[in-house]
């Protein structure tokens, strides 16, 4: 596997870096009304205006027809900047799955170049990314009726459409459709999130995507999640390295102390390992290969190791790490939200253990305890 960025990936990274330099600072985000969801609407508009949101779209919609490998690079840059915008949700949870599943997808994508948000309802109560969702989609005349309950639906209130995994496939639902109830839920980063109740929500036949749609959505979502998480790890490590190189104690930078330098090194290894896992997952998906193991390994590393690195980096900042006008807390809080979205370390280890047991032809149960 060649880890050198292609010319397209390098161009995406350069464009993303340039646009993300205008992201709202931690101080600016802290000044927003924190009784409401907090996200960078100004940056989101610029991402649309600069064509960043159109990168994976078909040429018929003015896009560049790029895939998960290039979107993964973009999300890594979003993570490095700790930008509070729904690029992950719109491209990773929405555009890429819709394009992969085909059908009548373009009608749901038409508003994305102008800044429409897409998202997915990946989790159910007590069941993160379930392979067999409890939410149902029952045939009714020339359409379907969707009933169920989803949790941790990011940017649901702001979205034009939500991809909803069901027993029959992935339903594309408008969040303001009759029968949909959204209830705001708390996030560590204060980014928008809701519980989504669906009570007999009608959709037309073209709004139900089948053919292994739930697994396709989950694989792309996990690869995208891991890419952004890798960027968060890299961004926090870089911020910490800069801090410990300039913060002096006992007459010299604290980076000169072995205990500090070892913790920075540990954080670096965590971020690079997650980047490797995410890159591998994106590459396999882009090549049409089985990426189940790669996405599950990346999700486990995200859930198990990235929070430890974030805690270490925050600790090395001292009291500054808890200052909401300083960027360190953004990386930590966004990481907490992503860990919760994938289900936490015990859940991910159980999934990974079951996958290994299946490959070995044995039954097994795993726990991180």
Q: Model-found features: residue ranges?
A:
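Short glycine/proline-enriched turns and hinge-like loops at secondary-structure junctions
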Residues: 66, 129-132, 155-159
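Short beta-strand-to-turn element immediately C-terminal to the catalytic PLP-Schiff-base lysine
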Residues: 98-102, 138, 164-167, 172-175, ...
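Flexible, small-/acidic-enriched active-site or ligand-binding loops
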Residues: 134, 152-155, 175-207, 211-213
């Amino acid at each position: 596997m060649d880890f050198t960025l292609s010319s397209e990936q390098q161009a995406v990274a350069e464009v993303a870096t340039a646009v993300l330099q205008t992201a709202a600072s931690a101080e600016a985000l802290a000044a927003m009304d924190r009784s409401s969801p907090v996200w960078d609407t100004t940056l989101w508009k610029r991402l649309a205006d600069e064509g960043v949101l159109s990168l994976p779209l078909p040429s018929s919609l003015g896009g560049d027809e790029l895939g998960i490998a290039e979107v993964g690079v973009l999300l890594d840059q979003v993570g490095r900047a700790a930008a509070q915008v729904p690029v992950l949700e719109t491209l990773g949870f929405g555009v890429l799955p819709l394009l992969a599943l085909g059908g009548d997808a373009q009608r749901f994508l038409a508003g994305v170049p102008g800044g429409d948000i897409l998202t997915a309802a990946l989790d159910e109560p007590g069941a993160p990314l379930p392979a067999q969702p409890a939410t149902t989609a029952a045939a009714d005349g020339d359409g379907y009726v969707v009933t169920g309950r989803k949790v941790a639906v990011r940017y649901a209130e702001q979205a034009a459409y939500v991809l909803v995994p069901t027993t029959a496939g992935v339903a594309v639902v408008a969040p303001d459709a009759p029968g949909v109830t959204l209830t705001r839920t708390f996030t560590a980063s204060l980014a928008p999130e809701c519980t989504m109740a669906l009570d007999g929500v009608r959709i037309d036949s073209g709004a139900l995507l089948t053919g292994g749609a739930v697994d396709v959505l989950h694989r792309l979502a996990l690869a995208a999640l891991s890419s952004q998480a890798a960027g968060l790890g890299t961004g926090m490590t870089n911020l910490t390295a800069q801090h410990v190189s300039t913060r002096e104690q006992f007459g010299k930078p604290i980076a000169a102390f072995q205990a500090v330098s070892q913790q920075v090194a540990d954080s670096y290894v965590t971020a690079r390992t997650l980047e490797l896992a995410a890159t591998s997952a994106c590459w396999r998906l882009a090549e049409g290969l089985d990426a189940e193991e790669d996405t599950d390994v990346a999700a486990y590393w995200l859930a198990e190791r990235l929070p430890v690195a974030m805690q270490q980096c925050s600790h090395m900042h001292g009291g500054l790490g808890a200052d909401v006008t300083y960027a360190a807390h953004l990386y930590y809080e966004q990481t907490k939200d992503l860990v919760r979205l994938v289900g936490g370390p015990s859940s991910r280890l159980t999934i990974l253990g079951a996958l290994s047991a299946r490959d070995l032809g044995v039954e097994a149960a795993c726990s991180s305890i």
